[in-house]
Amino acid sequence: MGKKIDNPESSAKVSDAEEEEEEYAVEKIIDRRVRKGKVEYYLKWKGYPETENTWEPENNLDCQDLIQQYEASRKDEEKSAASKKDRPSSSAKAKETQGRASSSTSTASKRKSEEPTAPSGNKSKRTTDAEQDTIPVSGSTGFDRGLEAEKILGASDNNGRLTFLIQFKGVDQAEMVPSSVANEKIPRMVIHFYEERLSWYSDNED
């Protein structure tokens, strides 16, 4: 927009030397850019809508006060932005610390789970060598999975808890099953297991 020439009288009455320039007042500077090596400012003109804003070269402007104020404000904003970028916020530091702590805890837990469990010594008495290849007693048994028991291979007193080593059909590994479950699911097989291991003694009386 810059400066416009206003000719209130006709050109016939006024010569070129007498042409008068009417300067438009700058309300505020909105933005700044460098184009082809020259600094230009995006101006809001006083008394005109935003749609009339224009880019004007610095050397065409006569509003040094507004330019100085805008440049000072722009430098302050740049310093503030640089300061925030260089120094992360306390919340970001806290999240980073928390993340490291969580990672350390996770690593420690993983290492602990990978460590072999120490042997329990002679707390449990094993009656057969087949227990070396057994599935330990857990919350679920082969019965819970719908398997059919084929044979009781042995029994074990595990910390005062009687368990049976049961071979299920279609499964390679035998499984330790609590006696309470076996007594309910396969009572006849349990009785047969005991009968096979009973020794009968008779006293010969003269």
From Swiss-Prot:
Q: Where is the Chromo domain?
A: 24-82, 147-205
Q: Name one Pfam family in it.
A: Chromo
Q: In which tissues is it expressed?
A: Salivary gland (at protein level).
Instruction: Extract the GO molecular function terms from the UniProt entry.
Output: chromatin binding; histone binding; Hsp70 protein binding; methylated histone binding; mRNA binding; protein-containing complex binding; protein-macromolecule adaptor activity; rDNA binding
> Modified residue Phosphothreonine is at which positions?
127-128, 134
Annotated site, Histone H3K9me2 binding, chain positions: 24, 45, 48
Q: Which GO terms describe its cellular component?
A: chromocenter; chromosome; chromosome, centromeric region; chromosome, telomeric region; condensed chromosome; condensed chromosome, centromeric region; euchromatin; heterochromatin
The subcellular localization recorded is:
Nucleus; Nucleus, Nucleoplasm; Chromosome; Chromosome, Telomere
Q: What is its main location?
A: nucleus
Entry keyword set: Chromatin regulator, Chromosome, Nucleus, Phosphoprotein, Repeat, Repressor, Telomere, Transcription, Transcription regulation
Q: How does it assemble?
A: Homodimer. Probably associates with Su(var)3-9. Interacts with Mcm10. Interacts (via chromoshadow domain) with piwi (via N-terminal region). Interacts with Rrp6. Associates with and may be part of the HipHop-HOAP telomere capping complex but is not required for its stability or telomere localization. Interacts (via the chromo domain 2 (chromoshadow domain) and the hinge region between chromo domains 1 and 2) with cav/HOAP (via C-terminus); the interaction is direct. Each molecule of cav/HOAP interacts with 2 molecules of Su(var)205/HP1. Interacts with HipHop (via N-terminus).
What is the protein name given in its UniProt record? Heterochromatin protein 1
Q: Which gene encodes it?
A: Su(var)205
